[in-house]
């Protein structure tokens, strides 16, 4: 079936000559400013390297790595590749690293997840069919493996050596050696493996089956299921948690909002609805709220609203007060933060100042097209070597006693 103009990306390509002459773009970031709502507008002049100028590998700095196509397989949201943006230089586009990951017909496959192993200096990209490991210094693909049952959104252990890799909505997860890609173990869960978070402690992995109202917990020493959290009000979609692995916040089917669970007792604690905005149909994911993140200081929960193209901000503590709402340019399906909590990244392309709620920039590629993706991660480099990395999930990052 032919894709609609909206699916392919409705933004018109901005003429490069206009930018070279110094024209600027105004970003529509208007947000209502009454009660629990705040205003947010911004403008920017994109700054990108000449399209034909080669960019060297390696580098030193703090970068945002964005894997595309990161919204289904829509190439209108940034094309195909691993796009690099300089966070400390106004999120300027740096380069596009060629990637693999193709359907059998040769067209780019949907990117399903992205993660980093700092010790192996590698970034990993999962697609519908397989997984590729890319060396951050050489920017070459080290290996690409097609996994039986396909792949979904994975998560790597804190020591960088083990990956929990869900099959593509099948009944199992693979436990994978990140250096070789070899399968260490297989964990049968339910029917539709989907999202994964390897706990910050390294002792537990949390697995969401998108047709189950339970969040499954595995012991990472035995690779066996040891606990179920919930059950929640409907099947679990994206989720996030506090750094001490005490509280989990989850999106669930049909809810514009989120639910809260206790990771220690296994109980569901609360159901929180977005107030003042209508629920209804969405373009993607079949769910009004697909995307949730905890600010690194663990004070706020940011929740995507695909119905109204908004980001809603809540207090992370009961009674979970609704604080404000930010208007976005397209449907958000994901949100994450920089490690320091300065910036929030919506999958609709906005770079948001987390404290002021202002939209500062739109991510744009070498052709000045807006880049949208649900698969992005912050990486710190020193001479081409990773020294620290964020996460595709917006996780709590408060220090834990004993760490």
Label each PLM-derived region with a short phrase.
Residues 23-24, 86:
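Generic short alpha-helical hydrophobic face used as a protein-protein interaction/packing hotspot
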């Amino acid at each position: 079936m032919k894709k609609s103009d909206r699916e392919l990306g409705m933004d018109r390509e901005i003429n490069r000559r206009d930018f070279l002459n110094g024209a600027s773009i105004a970003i529509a970031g208007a947000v209502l400013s009454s009660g629990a709502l705040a205003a947010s507008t911004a403008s920017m002049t994109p700054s990108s390297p000449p399209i034909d100028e080669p960019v060297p590998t390696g580098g030193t700095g703090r970068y945002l790595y964005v894997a595309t196509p990161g919204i289904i397989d829509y190439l209108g949201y940034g094309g195909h590749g691993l796009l690099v943006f300089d966070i400390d230089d106004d999120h300027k586009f740096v380069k596009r690293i060629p990637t693999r990951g193709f359907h059998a017909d040769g067209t780019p496959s949907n990117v399903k997840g992205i993660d980093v192993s700092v010790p192996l200096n590698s970034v990993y990209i999962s697609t519908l069919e397989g997984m590729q490991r890319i060396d951050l210094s050489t920017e070459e693909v080290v290996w690409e493996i097609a996994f039986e049952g396909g792949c979904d959104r994975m998560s790597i252990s804190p020591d960088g050596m083990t990956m929990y890799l869900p099959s593509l909505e099948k009944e199992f997860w693979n436990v994978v050696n990140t250096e070789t890609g070899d399968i260490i173990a297989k964990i049968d869960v339910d029917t539709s493996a989907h999202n994964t978070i390897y706990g910050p402690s390294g002792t537990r992995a949390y697995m969401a089956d998108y047709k189950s109202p339970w969040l499954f917990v595995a012991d990472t020493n035995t690779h066996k299921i040891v606990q179920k959290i919930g059950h929640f009000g409907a099947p679990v979609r994206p989720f996030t948690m506090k750094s001490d692995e005490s509280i989990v916040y989850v999106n669930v089917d049909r809810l514009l909002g989120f639910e809260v669970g206790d990771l220690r007792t296994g109980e569901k604690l609360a159901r929180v609805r977005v107030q003042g905005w209508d629920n209804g149909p969405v373009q993607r994911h079949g769910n009004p709220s697909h995307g949730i993140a905890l600010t690194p200081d663990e004070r706020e929960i940011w929740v995507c609203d695909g119905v109204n193209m908004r980001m809603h901000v809540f207090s992370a503590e009961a009674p979970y007060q609704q604080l404000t709402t930010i208007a976005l340019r397209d449907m958000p399906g994901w949100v994450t933060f920089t490690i320091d909590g300065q910036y929030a990244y919506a999958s609709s392309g906005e770079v948001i100042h987390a404290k002021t709620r202002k939209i500062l920039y739109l991510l744009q590629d070498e052709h000045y097209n807006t880049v949208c993706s649900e698969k992005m991660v912050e990486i710190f480099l020193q001479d081409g070597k990773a020294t620290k990395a964020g996460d595709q999930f917006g996780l709590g990052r408060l220090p834990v006693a004993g760490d």
